[in-house]
């Protein structure tokens, strides 16, 4: 964890120097009964954009963090002023203590309203997972963001949905064969309200997220058990925009 902290500190320092969009979130997960610290950064440039986030999990019954998960992605687009400006190449790495490392490569398409209040990104990616057999080495991703929804200043709705192929072994069937699933789905819609606007602290937001997951509970068996079906995990907390 010390190496992770040093790495995150260096990344945040570089992000501030580059005038990137950075935020930190602290949320309480009601089902898993732990706190999750999330650090996010997004930076657009003349050649595309860079995005990363890191989740650090803090079980309340232990003094040390339980684990972490990280994603870092680079969108490459040096043809932004052409008719294909909405289409970018995409490269990504993700992994952590609770998930196998994976490399992803593919394309993304960015849609937005004229004032950029509403944004949607569609991704089609080749995905290879370390030490895992996949029937189809692909992932489909949707990312969205909406500002001032319903005409309410400071109310934002954002999130993502991922669908990919990955083999999970959940135990043994009655006939003795391994109980294996082949596809995974996860979505985490978030809603945040800029409560700080009322007392001269526009960085502060209150809100949370709900995680919808199918065949994704393997890392959380103490909570969900051998549940291969849809699991729902609500969380709430605070977000600080730097």
Residue ranges and their predicted role:
Residues 1-21:
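Cleavable N-terminal export/targeting peptides
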Residues 21, 47-49, 77-89, 112-120, ...:
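Short loop/turn motifs that connect adjacent beta-strands in outer-membrane beta-barrel proteins
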Residues 26-32, 56-60, 91-97, 111, ...:
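Transmembrane beta-strands of outer-membrane beta-barrel pores
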Residues 39, 72-74, 78, 105-107, ...:
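Membrane-embedded beta-strands of outer-membrane beta-barrel proteins
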Residues 129-219, 240-242:
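Outer-membrane beta-barrel transmembrane domain signature
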Residues 230-242:
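Outer-membrane beta-barrel "beta-signal"
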């Amino acid at each position: 964890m010390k190496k992770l902290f040093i790495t995150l500190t260096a990344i945040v320092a570089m992000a501030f120097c580059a005038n990137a969009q950075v935020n930190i979130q602290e949320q309480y997960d009601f089902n898993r009964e732990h706190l999750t610290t999330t650090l996010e950064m997004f930076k657009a440039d003349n050649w595309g954009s860079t995005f990363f986030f890191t989740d650090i999990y803090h079980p309340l019954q232990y003094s040390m963090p339980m684990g972490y998960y990280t994603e870092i992605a680079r969108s490459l687009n040096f043809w932004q002023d052409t008719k294909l400006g909405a289409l970018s190449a995409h490269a990504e790495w993700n992994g952590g203590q609770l998930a196998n490392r994976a490399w992803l490569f593919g394309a993304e398409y960015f849609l937005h309203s004229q004032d950029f209040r509403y944004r949607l990104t569609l991704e089609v990616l080749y995905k290879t997972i370390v030490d895992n057999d996949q029937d189809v080495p692909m992932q489909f991703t949707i990312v969205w963001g909406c500002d001032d929804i319903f005409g309410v200043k400071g109310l934002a709705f954002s999130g993502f949905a991922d669908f990919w192929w990955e083999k999970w072994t959940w135990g043994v069937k009655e006939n003795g064969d391994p109980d294996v699933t082949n596809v995974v789905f996860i979505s985490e819609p978030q809603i945040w309200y800029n409560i700080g606007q009322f007392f001269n602290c526009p960085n502060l937001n209150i809100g949370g997220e709900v995680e919808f997951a199918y065949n994704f509970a393997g890392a959380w068996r103490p909570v969900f058990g051998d549940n291969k079906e849809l699991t729902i995990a609500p969380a709430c907390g605070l977000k600080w925009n730097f």
